[in-house]
């Protein structure tokens, strides 16, 4: 065992080692967060989860580190991994392109310093004169502080910079930078003063309010020039690592040891991938297009385990990937949710099967507070499977139904027309609708605006439904939650609004239907087929299908109405609850007629005649979806039109930036949170950002199958706030330190230096 690793990982917290002359040396805690560009480091994060320790193991490579040092860091990381039982998740980190998880370990940010062990660096003497240093501050939550060449040529007006001149530390705020960037810049300047100058330097803020003399004082430190000489906002591609593409190909590669003891690799599949492709006896490499995972089977050989990361490096070199491409090593039965999400199906232990989303106890409490008859945690696995299949997505969004009211209108010639209340719940696949739902919370009215888009609705109608929804929200002063609903993927609350009386018919006005009042009689041949979905009286719905055998599914219940009979067809995989819901649907779509119950396999000729004859149909049960954990992203559109995604690991409410649009992926639904300070273009493109996020999502989710909700700052529903570890509704009014507050504290701190 490496002596420096003795006792490693036994207690919670962060531990860092540096590679010095090919040896592992403990790194001083007071220097955590400072990394020399010429060095390599090993970073271990230990946490206690319900009494069990778990580990994330990172090895960090500076941009100027030697190949030998980098190799030593990788080898020693494997040794530490073995010491911890081979279960840590390993991460390869490269300077400037670290994972958000790594950056989140350092609350004051990460600072890159020139030099290293091999170059003979020395500790800073706070009383000794030394040349000026310029730092580029990037990131709003995960801060990177990179040392750059001193001079105005290294600066731009869209970012913030720190100029360290010894007795003065200047914080330059680019005119185009945002308030959150500026706040982080001051926070980054304070450690430079405290750590490098023993608190004896003054911090001087250079922004639009700075005097000419203050701005001029920094010019000598920059080697001449003035703020006017600084380049415009950077529009380069330095954030390309965060850009997501729709065309990334996800591939799976087998890593194995052949009969001669030589490690081999070969590609075994492309997306869609199945969990069954992974063999416990071997190792596998998953190439996601933006990063690489190495999966270690529990029965793989020691050589395969040791060589797998080395092979990953060779694979990336062969593919021409950048050296900073993220690599993670995961072990069987301890796969993170992000890894499992790349597979179309993933069998979890029965007690872990969920609705596609992982819930904390706090989130469960928020759900049960609004819908007391629904408690997922108490359900048997088979019941949870039925809920996953029938209850509809976004089931956490279930506000209290009491005293609620609704207004429904379809789009006719791209205009909203009211729907007669007696026909609420009847939808046509050729139309789009807007539904306004009003409910009360603590005596105050709250609103949800649904825009429902039929599968056969025209693109103009779909676009118009979104426009009308925005208009209605504006009339409500931005207080509504906007929810896009695609036919067949209605959220649980949307279904419950109609209390079991929802029917989706084929066609629409443009398709030649007479009108909605003829729904129970109009059909050219007197034959109609409906698929039944639902778990209780409140969420049952009937979806009309094409009258052919191929529309049937063994996992479901169907209602077949013919001129002479009405059949209730029970698939072999259907539950008793689904059968009961089917009987209620018969009363709804085919009232006043005798019902004939037919079990799958016992159909008569008249039944098949109504479907145009026997035919093949789906008989296999859909497999379980992998559990997905909530994730928060800061999303922007780059000047080139690409989606830039920056994930916030271990996120909290404080990560919701007032100046930005954020995307919260709950694992079930996707929320678009619009900050009050976001610009008009970002507000206008909020839904587009979420749609692009889903399109570039490497999992099997599709745009149509994912519910998108748009919410404004200050109007967050309980389903949204419950995803966060804690929520303070007054935070933005009095809970956060603003840039102006932080700036006002600077003179007070400087006064103590004099």
Curated annotation (Swiss-Prot):
SUPFAM superfamilies, per database record: Actin depolymerizing proteins
Q: Where does Ca(2+) 1 bind?
A: 430-431, 461
The induction field says: Interaction with actin is suppressed by PIP2.
Q: What is its main location?
A: cytoplasm
Pfam families per the UniProt record, alphabetical? Gelsolin
Kindly list the positions annotated as binding Ca(2+) 2: 556, 578
A Gene Ontology annotation in the biological process aspect, one of them, is:
barbed-end actin filament capping
Q: Where is this region: Actin-binding, Ca-sensitive?
A: 386-751
Q: Where is the composition biased (Low complexity)?
A: 210-220
SMART domains on file: GEL (SM00262)
Positions of the region Disordered? 209-238
- Keywords for the protein's UniProt record, in alphabetical order: Actin capping, Actin-binding, Calcium, Cytoplasm, Cytoskeleton, Metal-binding, Repeat
GO cellular component term of the entry, any? cytoplasm
Q: Where in the cell is it found?
A: Cytoplasm, Cytoskeleton
Q: Which family does it belong to?
A: Belongs to the villin/gelsolin family.
Function, as annotated, reads: Calcium-regulated, actin-modulating protein that binds to the plus (or barbed) ends of actin monomers or filaments, preventing monomer exchange (end-blocking or capping). It can promote the assembly of monomers into filaments (nucleation) as well as sever filaments already formed.
Name this protein carries in UniProt: Gelsolin, cytoplasmic
Instruction: Specify the taxonomic lineage.
Output: Eukaryota, Metazoa, Ecdysozoa, Arthropoda, Crustacea
């Amino acid at each position: 065992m490496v002596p420096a690793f003795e006792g490693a990982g036994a207690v919670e917290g962060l531990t860092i080692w540096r590679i010095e002359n090919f040896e592992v040396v403990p790194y001083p805690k007071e220097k955590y967060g400072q990394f020399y560009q010429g060095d390599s480091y090993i970073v271990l994060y230990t946490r206690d989860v319900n009494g069990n320790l778990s580990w994330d193991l990172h090895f960090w490579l500076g941009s100027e580190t030697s190949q030998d040092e980098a190799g030593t860091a990788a080898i020693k990381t494997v040794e530490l991994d073995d010491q911890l039982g081979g279960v840590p998740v390993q991460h390869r980190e490269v300077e400037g392109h670290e994972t958000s998880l790594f950056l989140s370990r350092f609350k004051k940010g990460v600072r890159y310093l020139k030099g290293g062990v091999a170059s003979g660096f020395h500790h800073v003497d706070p009383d000794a004169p030394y040349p000026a240093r310029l730092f580029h501050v990037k990131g709003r939550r995960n801060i990177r502080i990179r040392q750059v060449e001193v001079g105005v040529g290294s600066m731009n007006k869209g970012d913030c910079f720190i100029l360290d001149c010894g007795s003065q530390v200047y914080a330059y705020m680019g005119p185009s930078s945002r308030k959150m960037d500026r706040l982080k810049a001051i926070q980054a300047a304070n450690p430079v003063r405290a750590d490098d100058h023993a608190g004896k330097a003054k911090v001087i803020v250079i922004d639009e309010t700075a005097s000419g003399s203050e701005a001029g004082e920094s010019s000598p430190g920059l080697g001449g020039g003035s703020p006017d000489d600084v380049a415009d906002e950077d529009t380069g591609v330095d954030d390309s690592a965060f850009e997501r593409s729709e065309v990334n190909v996800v591939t799976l590669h087998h890593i194995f040891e052949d009969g001669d003891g030589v490690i081999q690799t070969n590609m075994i599949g492309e997306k869609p991938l199945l969990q069954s492709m992974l063999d416990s006896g071997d190792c596998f490499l998953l190439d996601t297009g933006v990063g690489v995972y190495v999966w270690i089977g529990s029965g793989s050989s020691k050589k395969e385990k040791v060589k797998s990361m080395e092979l990953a490096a060779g694979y990336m070199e062969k593919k021409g990937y950048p050296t900073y491409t993220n690599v993670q090593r995961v072990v069987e039965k301890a796969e993170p949710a992000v890894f499992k999400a790349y597979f179309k199906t993933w069998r979890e232990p029965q007690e872990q099967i969920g609705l596609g989303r992982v819930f904390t106890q706090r989130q469960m409490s928020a759900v049960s507070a609004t819908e007391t008859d629904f408690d997922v945690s108490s359900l048997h696995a088979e019941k949870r499977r039925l809920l996953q299949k029938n209850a509809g997505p976004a089931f956490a969004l279930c506000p209290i139904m009491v005293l609620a009211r609704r207004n429904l209108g379809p789009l006719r010639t791209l205009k909203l027309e009211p729907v007669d209340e007696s026909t609420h719940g009847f939808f046509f696949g050729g139309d789009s609708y807007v539904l306004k739902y009003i409910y009360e919370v603590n005596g105050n009215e709250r609103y949800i605006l649904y825009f429902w888009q039929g599968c056969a609705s025209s693109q103009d109608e779909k676009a118009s439904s979104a426009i009308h929804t925005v208009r209605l929200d504006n009339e409500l002063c931005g207080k509504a939650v906007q929810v896009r609903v695609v036919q067949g993927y209605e959220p649980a609350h949307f279904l419950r609004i109609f209390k079991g009386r929802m029917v989706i018919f084929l066609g629409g006005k443009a398709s030649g239907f007479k009108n909605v009042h003829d729904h129970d009689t109009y059909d050219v041949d007197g034959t109609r087929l409906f698929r039944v979905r639902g778990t209780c009286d409140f969420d049952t719905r009937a979806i009309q299908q094409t009258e052919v055998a191929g529309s049937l599914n063994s996992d479901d219940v169907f209602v077949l109405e013919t001129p002479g009979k009405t059949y209730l067809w029970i698939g072999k995989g259907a539950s008793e609850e689904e059968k009961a819901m089917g009987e209620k649907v018969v009363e709804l779509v085919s009232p006043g007629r005798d019902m004939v119950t037919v079990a799958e396999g016992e159909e008569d000729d008249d039944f098949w005649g109504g479907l145009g004859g026997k035919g093949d149909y789906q008989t296999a049960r859909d497999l379980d979806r992998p559990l997905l954990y909530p994730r928060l992203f800061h999303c922007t559109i780059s000047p080139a039109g690409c989606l830039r995604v920056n994930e916030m690991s271990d996120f909290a409410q404080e990560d919701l930036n007032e100046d930005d649009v954020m995307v919260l992926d709950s694992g079930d639904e996707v929320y678009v949170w619009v900050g009050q300070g976001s610009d008009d273009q970002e507000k206008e493109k909020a839904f587009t950002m979420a749609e692009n996020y889903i399109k570039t999502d490497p999992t099997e989710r599709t745009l149509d199958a994912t519910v998108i909700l748009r919410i404004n700052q200050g109007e967050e529903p309980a389903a949204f706030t419950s995803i966060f570890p804690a929520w303070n509704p007054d935070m933005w009014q009095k809970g956060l330190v603003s840039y102006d507050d932080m700036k006002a504290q600077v003179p007070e701190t400087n006064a103590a230096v004099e």
